[in-house]
């Protein structure tokens, strides 16, 4: 057996353990929230896995509308910013337990027709390798005002 093959076989399990040992912190989730408030889709996506899933709070399915993979999720987030040019998620609080997390927030935004929205909501996260694998969003449904 070649020395390089033996070295690989000996250290590959250690490499796998190191990769799966990445922990998400509250600072990481705050950085994610800051990227949303900056409407910085590139920064947002850097927090998510390549095979990420975004389950929107509204849509035709029981779990809202589901977007899978970096491209679909990126387009979904860009669409939110187009609908709500002043979208903001404030008063964020983050909670983490193992590979799951929760962020509570107050969403405010104004649609292009002048409709104002202010609702509480939360994101339920599943983490993988130190990034967000699933972002499942929930928010209150409230009468809107102009």
Segments predicted by a language model, with ranges:
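Residue-level signal for well-ordered, solvent-exposed loop/turn and beta-edge residues enriched
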Residues: 53, 115, 131-133
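Short, surface-exposed coil-to-beta transition loops
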Residues: 88-89, 104, 117-123
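A short hydrophobic beta-strand element
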Residues: 98-107
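Short, cysteine-centered beta-strand-loop-beta hairpins and adjacent loop/turn segments enriched
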Residues: 83, 108-118
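Short, low-complexity N-terminal intrinsically disordered segments enriched in polar/charged residues
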Residues: 16-46, 70
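Bacterial Sec-dependent N-terminal signal peptides
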Residues: 1-21
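A solvent-exposed, acidic/Ser-Thr-rich amphipathic alpha-helical stretch
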Residues: 46-92
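Short beta-strand edge/turn micro-motifs at domain boundaries
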Residues: 120-143
């Amino acid at each position: 057996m070649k020395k390089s093959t033996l070295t690989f076989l000996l250290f590959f399990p250690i490499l796998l353990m190191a990769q799966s040992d990445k922990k998400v912190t509250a600072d990481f989730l705050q950085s994610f929230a800051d990227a949303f408030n900056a409407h910085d889709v590139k920064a947002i996506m850097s927090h998510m896995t390549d095979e990420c899933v975004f389950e929107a709070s509204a849509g035709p399915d029981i779990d809202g509308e589901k977007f899978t993979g970096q491209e679909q999720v990126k387009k979904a987030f860009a669409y939110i910013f187009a609908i709500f040019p002043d979208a903001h998620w404030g008063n964020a609080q983050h909670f983490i337990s193992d590979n799951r997390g929760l962020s509570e927030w107050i969403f405010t935004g104004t649609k292009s027709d002048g409709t104002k929205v202010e609702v509480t909501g939360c994101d339920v996260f599943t983490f993988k390798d130190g990034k967000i694998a699933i972002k499942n969003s929930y928010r209150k449904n409230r009468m809107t005002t102009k």
